[in-house]
A protein has these predicted regions:
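Bacterial N-terminal signal peptides
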Residues: 6-17
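An extracytoplasmic/periplasmic, membrane-proximal ligand-sensing/linker region
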Residues: 27-29, 219, 248-249, 278-343
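Hinge/capping helix and adjacent helix->loop/strand transition within the periplasmic-binding protein
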Residues: 56-61, 80-91, 99-188, 192-197, ...
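Short helix-initiation/N-cap motifs at beta->coil->alpha
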Residues: 69-77, 180-195, 206-210, 317
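A ligand-binding cleft/hinge motif common to bilobed small-molecule-binding domains
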Residues: 97-109, 163, 167-172, 195, ...
Length: 343
């Protein structure tokens, strides 16, 4: 009798073990996405939107929670995901697309290797714009060059378009901006412009045109776009020249044009979601595949369109390849990037 009970117990344990082995890894679990900016900015809004449609695309239908960890232009969040979070595919990060700048120039705060993040995907690629309050006395590049007092631009941190786009313009066109960093996110930077504390800021075209207060500001004429980074003019700002047009007009040297291409490659990273290095390959595949399905969900596409967002997803595989490409640059490029980033 005891043998039968023991055999039955063994069979039951093996059966349970087999069921557990067959159950999807993410079943009954919670994925946490750490957003490196404060609530209300473009990265935060995109991440929260994706998080609503992503779980049902992941085998096991896990919960997804979003946590804000602002600071250092997402440096704090990036370091946390890379070096503190377990590489189990349960903690991800939504970080700034240009953090590779900081690694290239050797900032001591960097505790990650850009190429070794687990790249999951991005819901969009971005083009940068630089916009001003309409009552600011700067209508052209020449106005900025001749100004007795440089324009005051709000910025979050060096890895954000709020900072690197005006700094690139300084380097390429010989301009001067008074860039004030430290804003936790785009919402706080916008508030400073609304109050008149700041006169300008860099932004992605999608966040500027696709959410408030940008949409209302454009409609009411409160702001104007001075310059944009896309290869062609955005139809929503047809009067604003592109950086490429201006470089052609001003006969910018080829070395500066190459620098612009490297810096503006950050736009391809878009709104990247990453994991720690060392996530098991099967979980990487699950996360990448499900992410691309989530951003292709008809309901998500409809929501993005309603919000005025430019849905242009980038796969984790493409982000991984781009990360390896941008991180290897010649010494002269790195020296100029140090000037851009103030090191």
């Amino acid at each position: 009798m005891l043998k039968k009970i023991a055999f039955g117990l063994l069979f039951f344990l093996l059966w349970v073990s087999n069921l557990q082995a067959q159950a999807p890894f993410y079943q009954g679990k919670t994925i946490r996405i750490v957003v490196g900016f404060a609530p209300g900015g473009a990265v935060d809004l995109w991440t929260r939107a994706v998080a609503r449609y992503w779980p049902k695309r992941i085998p096991g239908n896990p919960d997804i929670v979003v946590q804000n960890m602002p600071g250092g232009g997402t440096m704090i969040a990036a370091n946390y995901v890379y070096g503190v979070a377990k590489p189990d595919g349960l903690t991800l990060g939504a970080i700034a697309p240009a953090l590779y700048f900081d690694q290239l120039i050797g900032r001591k705060e960097v505790q990650f290797d850009w190429t070794k993040f687990t790249w999951i995907g991005s819901p969009e690629q971005i083009d940068e714009v630089l916009f001003f309050r309409a009552d600011a006395p700067y209508k052209t590049l020449e106005d900025i060059r001749k100004a007795a007092e440089p324009p005051r631009c709000a910025a979050t941190g060096p890895a954000s378009a709020t900072y690197y786009f005006p700094k690139l313009l300084e380097e390429v066109f010989g301009l001067k901006f008074n860039i004030v960093t430290g804003y936790p996110g785009g919402a706080e930077a916008d508030l400073a412009i609304q109050k008149g504390e700041m006169q300008c800021r860099g932004a992605s075209s999608s966040s500027f045109f696709g959410r408030e207060p940008g949409r209302t500001w454009v409609k009411t004429g409160f702001v104007r776009v001075l310059i944009q980074a896309g290869s062609t003019r955005d139809a929503r700002a047809p009067e604003a020249p592109t950086i490429w047009e201006l470089m052609e007009k001003e006969k910018t040297p080829e070395a500066s044009r190459r620098l612009a291409k490297i810096v503006l490659a950050a736009g391809v990273f878009g709104r990247p979601i990453v994991g720690a290095p060392g996530v098991p390959p099967d979980r990487i595949k699950i996360l990448r595949d499900s992410f691309m399905k989530a951003v292709d969900d008809p309901e998500f596409v409809a929501e993005a369109k309603k919000r005025g967002w430019e849905l242009n997803p980038v796969s984790g595989e493409k982000l991984e390849a781009l990360a390896k490409e941008v991180i290897v640059q010649p010494a002269e490029v790195i020296e100029r990037m140090k000037r851009i980033l103030g090191k």
